[in-house]
Amino acid sequence: MSQWTPEYNELYTLKVDMKSEIPSDAPKTQESLKGILLHPEPIGAAKSFPAGVEMINSKVGNEFSHLCDDSQKQEKDMNGNQQEQEKSLVVRKKRKSQQAGPSYVQNCVKENQGILGLRQHLGTPSDEDNDSSFSDCLSSPSSSLHFGDSDTVTSDEDKEVSVRHSQTILNAKSRSHSARSHKWPRTETESVSGLLMKRPCLHGSSLRRLPCRKRFVKNNSSQRTQKQKERILMQRKKREVLARRKYALLPSSSSSSENDLSSESSSSSSTEGEEDLFVSASENHQNNPAVPSGSIDEDVVVIEASSTPQVTANEEINVTSTDSEVEIVTVGESYRSRSTLGHSRSHWSQGSSSHASRPQEPRNRSRISTVIQPLRQNAAEVVDLTVDEDEPTVVPTTSARMESQATSASINNSNPSTSEQASDTASAVTGSQPSTVSETSATLTSNSTTGTSIGDDSRRTTSSAVMETGPPAMPRLPSCCPQHSPCGGSSQNHHALGHPHTSCFQQHGHHFQHHHHHHHTPHPAVPVSPSFSDPACPVERPPQVQAPCGANSSSGTSYHEQQALPVDLSNNGIRSHGSGSFHGASAFDPCCPVSSSRAAIFGHQAAAAAPSQPLSSIDGYGSSMVAQPQPQPPPQPSLSSCRHYMPPTYASLTRPLHHQASACPHSHGNPPPQTQPPPQVDYVIPHPVHAFHSQISSHATSHPVAPPPPTHLASTAAPIPQHLPPTHQPISHHIPATAPPAQRLHPHEVMQRMEVRRRRMMQHPTRAHERPPPHPHRMHPNYGHGHHIHVPQTMSSHPRQAPERSAWELGIEAGVTAATYTPGALHPHLAHYHAPPRLHHLQLGALPLMVPDMAGYPHIRYISSGLDGTSFRGPFRGNFEELIHLEERLGNVNRGASQGTIERCTYPHKYKKRKLHCKQDGEEGTEEDTEEKCTICLSILEEGEDVRRLPCMHLFHQVCVDQWLITNKKCPICRVDIEAQLPSES
């Protein structure tokens, strides 16, 4: 710790620099932090801290020992490396606004026992938010990290960590990311806990690490004692209970709810052991190696999908807790993109409580559970985010907060005072820049105003850092957080991946920061090409992609306005690799104008493994986000694991809010070929939806923003590995492959368009050549399936020309089907054909013959499935043409008798009038008594006409009955099979 003392001073100086940028709130916290920084005693005392704190220290040290070049840090932390990593707790102060946590920290600092105080807070499980905050910070990696990050309060931990990381880290990082030194260059040498705590900050190039964050990293080599562990678990459980009670959080995310873990905190925390990897461009390399998943705090569940360095692949747990009670806990791998970095990601979403018990899981398995609780900032419908294990899906409630976070993330340091936002933003910027941006924009706009300019440069720095930041914990995304948070934390991880998207990030972050409204052009600069040596993600990540991101961010802007929508961001969470893609997510964030960050976050392919399939469907959730389809990484094949295509999942914001985490499975179903959506920079379209985003069940997604490569197809919900999780595929057929208008279309409109398309296709009857003169209504691909069935008509004894097909006939065909099978039995679309009304056209004479017979064929119910392979998608088909064709096709299905069979089984002859037996005696019988009618054409049989008597002895005109029998070999009257009667007929 003594080593850190100089660092502390240095950090303090940084802090001071930042301080001017920090809002009045932050200064207080900073003051206390300064106290800590100035007085290393707490750090020195840290060793006297409870074992838990020590554990954090050692753990952090261990974790980052690999990562950090800082030999000092390594020396300190190396001893307890793994254990410490596992146990290291970072105490992050919650924003003052959020909880007493930060103030606690301040008090502790004042007491010069800040660390101890924090430790104590952590140690003593308390239901109080303050206590829980601290305990969360300590016990819950996500808490502790994120709190520090999100807290406007200066993060002592940050300072400490940076100090620990030593000037070397400062030098190494050169803090270039943000002109501000206030972002402690977080070397990986920084104690692991420090990194974890600050992970977002770190890779955020410390940018995000605003002094705002109060984070105490206890670098003691002692492991956390059993008691402490129990306490942590207890605290988590309490928090979880409170969260559930309060916010009805998902079990997995409940732990963060009470804690109000900032998404950053969560996210950092989540990777606490594994990596507080704040991958800065500079620090990236350091962080990458470190962060063994094993080093994760017990409480932290690290999911390590990839063997690649755990670049700050924090799973983003965004627990956003605004001053109000809203907390969004988004636990998602912030895009497995991080995982591409190989950083393990803990899914905090599992709830702090679960973290402790949870073993590191493969990142793939990381689940993102985001619960959006009443978001204080946005209308914030509270959205439940269900997290797919594979797919982080967040149901973001729209929340300015998210934006603010994003802004904060970008601003990060820029507005310390909006520490919550700044930290959120930082986290967002780094991690879920796009998404956070969105949220931030709203909150930040006010808060981050000060930070805006700061945010800008910080963002800019962030942009480079952002990439690294990729993993930054998701900023607290109260509203949009699910999307952002997952995105932000991890998504930006793709930045960490060295994704060029950083610029996107930054753009999102800082622009949003300024105001979610601005469209941010990508800051191509900041390619920060994979500054971190992401083994999995070759540096090749092309920064160029960023531009598209930029564009997206623009669109994100658009979206943020919609951000009120409580969109599920579930798909967003999609860990699309193509983080870049969804940087644009700002558009993406339905909730957050700048949801793109959210998208980006997710996009960052939580699934490193399926890098190529960022699951662009990231849920396409924020259409905007989707807006930037950029499959940026495509150029970087090696990125494949890293591939951050965030295929912008444009699920339009219109996407049903109900759409849950993976809820929007079908919405992603569309695997638009969109192999690589053009980097549509600017999807201002509030809800551009990738075709594949059709995922929006509403089909609003009809706008397929340049879909990311199909691989991304993103089954946002589906495991990234699968490009198109089956869940999403369902919709795919509904959504036109072509990108429809960016604007949201009403589902019916979408269907209508599809219908038009379909009709065009159908205009080429497959068997038209086999048919009688084409009937306008018969121009259906299936038309040829059945020989033209002429419904018996009394008007003519000749086969009716197709054009003659009368309404009543149509009515019979359609009506019979409708009448026989209730709408439920019919294909959903058939119900749209209001066949029953047509029944009035039916003539009673025909009805008994036609309806019963046709009704008897179950095939009717399958007709709609489209034997030709096309299903009836159009909601309405004039004239029931579909039904008609189906009915005709039915004829083949029914296997009407062949002409040979008809001749063999029936008795054709010339009709001779004969008197009824009862009338034979008296000629007085009227002529009518002797008349017989063909029940098919309803014409009276004339002497000498060719008639055919069926085995059942019913008599019909040959022409009439032959037509019937070709379609159906049963008697039109009694429905007795002509062949079945053959033996008895003799």
Swiss-Prot record:
**Could you say which EC number(s) this protein's record lists?**
2.3.2.27
Q: Report the family membership.
A: Belongs to the Arkadia family.
* Zinc-finger ranges (RING-type): 934-975
Q: Position of cross-link Glycyl lysine isopeptide (Lys-Gly) (interchain with G-Cter in SUMO2)?
A: 19, 28, 34, 47, 59, 73, 87, 96, 110, 173, 198, 218, 915, 919
- Where in the sequence does UniProt note compositional bias of the Pro residues kind? 670-680
Residue ranges of region Disordered? Answer: 66-106, 120-191, 248-277, 337-373, 389-471, 506-561, 610-646, 659-684, 696-719
Per UniProt, the ranges with Basic and acidic residues bias are: 66-89
Task: Enumerate the residue ranges of region (Interaction with AXIN1).
Answer: 241-404
Q: What is this protein called?
A: E3 ubiquitin-protein ligase Arkadia
* Entries under Gene3D superfamilies matching the protein: Zinc/RING finger domain, C3HC4 (zinc finger) (3.30.40.10)
Check the record and name the InterPro entries matching this protein.
Answer: RNF111_N, Znf_RING, Znf_RING/FYVE/PHD, ZNRF3_Arkadia_E3_ligases
Query: Which organism was this protein described from?
Result: Pongo abelii (Sumatran orangutan)
Q: What class of enzyme is it?
A: transferase
Task: Name the segments for region: Ubiquitin binding.
Answer: 907-909, 949-953
Domain of life here?
Eukaryota
Reaction catalyzed: S-ubiquitinyl-[E2 ubiquitin-conjugating enzyme]-L-cysteine + [acceptor protein]-L-lysine = [E2 ubiquitin-conjugating enzyme]-L-cysteine + N(6)-ubiquitinyl-[acceptor protein]-L-lysine
Q: Name one GO molecular function term.
A: transferase activity
In what way is its activity controlled?
Binds free ubiquitin non-covalently via its RING-type zinc finger. Ubiquitin-binding leads to enhance the E3 ubiquitin-protein ligase activity by stabilizing the ubiquitin-conjugating enzyme E2 (donor ubiquitin) in the 'closed' conformation and activating ubiquitin transfer.
| Span of the annotated motif SUMO interaction motif 1 (SIM) | 300-304
Q: What is the gene name?
A: RNF111
Pathway stated in the Swiss-Prot or TrEMBL entry: Protein modification; protein ubiquitination
Record text about domains: The SUMO interaction motifs (SIMs) mediates the binding to polysumoylated substrate. The RING-type zinc finger mediates the E3 ubiquitin-protein ligase activity and binds directly to free ubiquitin. Non-covalent ubiquitin-binding stabilizes the ubiquitin-conjugating enzyme E2 (donor ubiquitin) in the 'closed' conformation and stimulates ubiquitin transfer.
